[in-house]
Regions:
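Alpha-helical transmembrane segments that form the membrane-embedded catalytic/substrate-binding core
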Residues: 78-82, 112-142
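Hydrophobic alpha-helical bundle signature of multipass membrane enzymes
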Residues: 1-113, 145-164, 168-254
């Protein structure tokens, strides 16, 4: 229900609609959670006293499900939703692409701090959302929705200098490092497996087509290729290549 978080009418309706398009259909992580049945971190610590104790934030204790068999954590649904919304907004307002990716990563990080998810859960949520977003943006049936979203974004930014004035370019290196950390969470890298070739998934170029309207698909794919992180990190070496795509860096060029 779009009205729950934003108006589906008015100047920015195109952006609201694109968020709904990306979050619609098969965008939920619930089926994956039911398949993997991977416990949330606070349940692990209760089960094994040798593990670090994880406590849920008091304000979230009411969200704990009584039945642990129906409360999987992998992949994180909140992280998935955050990235889907952020990618839709970034597509609409590409001038703020990297900033929106950073904000999505922050929500995933907050889920870890809250005690509701492990680093692995959050990484899975990012990967899932990236694949889902690309699929929906690549779908020709959504061409009108994408066009309307970009037009709404142009109304939002206009021809003034607001975007430039609000962008903290001095923090770029710090933000880039933060985003990379939240891609990997310093999980152990297999030193013997760091030379795998980058695989850019089919349709991934759609993620950045509004950011680089002057590039063709091949050129955008090379941007994704040249900014992908190295292989060897836990979970990130998926067969298609979604785990290694660094949209923060890719939105800033080769």
């Amino acid at each position: 229900n779009d009205s729950a978080w934003a108006s589906a009418t008015g100047d920015y309706a195109g952006i609201v609609n694109l968020v709904s398009v990306l979050r619609g259909g098969a965008a939920s992580t619930s089926p994956a959670k039911k398949f993997f049945k991977y416990m949330r971190p606070f349940r692990w610590s209760r089960k094994d006293a040798s593990l670090a104790k994880v406590t849920i934030l008091p304000s979230l204790t009411t969200m704990e499900k009584a039945d642990p068999s129906n409360d999987g954590g992998y992949p994180s649904g909140h992280t998935n939703a955050a990235y889907l919304a952020a990618i839709a907004m970034a597509y609409s307002v590409p001038e703020q692409y990297s900033e929106l990716m950073l904000r999505a990563s922050e929500l995933g990080y907050d889920r870890i701090v809250a005690g509701m998810h492990s680093c692995l859960d959050v990484i899975g949520g990012r990967m899932t959302s990236t694949a889902i977003a690309a699929s929906n943006l690549y779908d020709g049936n959504n061409a009108d929705a994408k066009k309307a979203a970009v037009q709404s974004g142009q109304k939002l930014t206009g021809n003034d200098s607001t975007v430039e004035e609000k962008s903290d370019y001095d923090a770029y290196q710090k933000d880039k490092d933060t985003y990379f950390y939240r891609m990997t969470y310093n999980l152990k890298e297999d030193s013997a497996d760091t030379t795998k070739a980058v695989s850019v998934p089919k349709g991934a170029e759609a993620l950045l087509e509004s950011r680089y309207p002057y590039m063709d698909d091949t050129q955008i794919r090379y941007v994704l290729y040249s900014t992908a992180i190295s292989s060897g990190y836990s979970v990130l070496d998926d067969a298609e290549g979604w785990g290694r795509l660094n949209l923060f860096e890719a939105s800033n060029g080769y």
